[in-house]
A protein has these predicted regions:
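Residues that scaffold the ATP/ADP-binding catalytic core of kinase and kinase-like folds
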Residues: 11-12, 43-44, 85, 115
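Cyclic nucleotide-binding regulatory domains
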Residues: 1-26
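Residues that recognize and position ribonucleotide moieties
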Residues: 1, 26, 34, 56, ...
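A conserved hydrophobic position in a structured secondary element of the catalytic/binding core
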Residues: 3-4, 28, 36-37, 46
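Phosphate-/nucleic-acid-contacting segments
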Residues: 76-125
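A small-molecule sensor/coupling module
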Residues: 21, 39-77, 81
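Short, well-ordered alpha-helical scaffold segment located
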Residues: 7-8, 40, 111
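Nucleotide phosphate-binding site architecture
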Residues: 9, 34, 42
Length: 125
């Protein structure tokens, strides 16, 4: 997944299970990272219902984005996936390298390049 400015990232499973995440996070642009220790975060949430609600909202947003990505991969052809991003997340298409975009769409870089060329010829881009 990709996260833009002022976005929060979390791993609900690691939070709930009190275990480290089992993948890595890579910043592809200059990034400022603020992290919280789990015990500190739980203590703050217990003292503030506002913080607790913010945490729930962050988790819900993350789960919705993940669900959307999985649904797109399962339901759409590679071209439909790319068109979906063009329509619904144009900032990703504009800012992310072809290599990262292809990985996100679960297609090869070459396939994405050919698809983009074909769509450009059809004036769809």
């Amino acid at each position: 997944q990709f996260f833009m400015e002022e976005a929060f990232f979390d791993d609900c499973g690691s939070y709930v299970n009190n275990q480290p995440i089992d993948y890595h996070i890579q910043a592809i642009e200059d990034t400022e990272i603020i992290y919280f220790y789990l015990d500190d975060l739980k203590a703050i949430a217990e003292k503030s219902s506002v913080i607790e609600r913010i945490g729930i909202k962050i988790a819900a947003d993350f789960l919705n984005n993940h669900r959307e990505h999985v649904t797109i991969l399962m339901k759409f052809s590679p071209e439909e996936r790319y068109k979906y991003l063009l329509t619904n997340k144009p900032e990703l298409v504009q800012r992310i390298s072809v290599t990262h975009l292809a990985q996100f769409l679960d297609i090869s870089r070459e396939t994405l390049s050919r698809m983009r060329a074909r769509l450009a010829e059809q004036n769809i881009l």
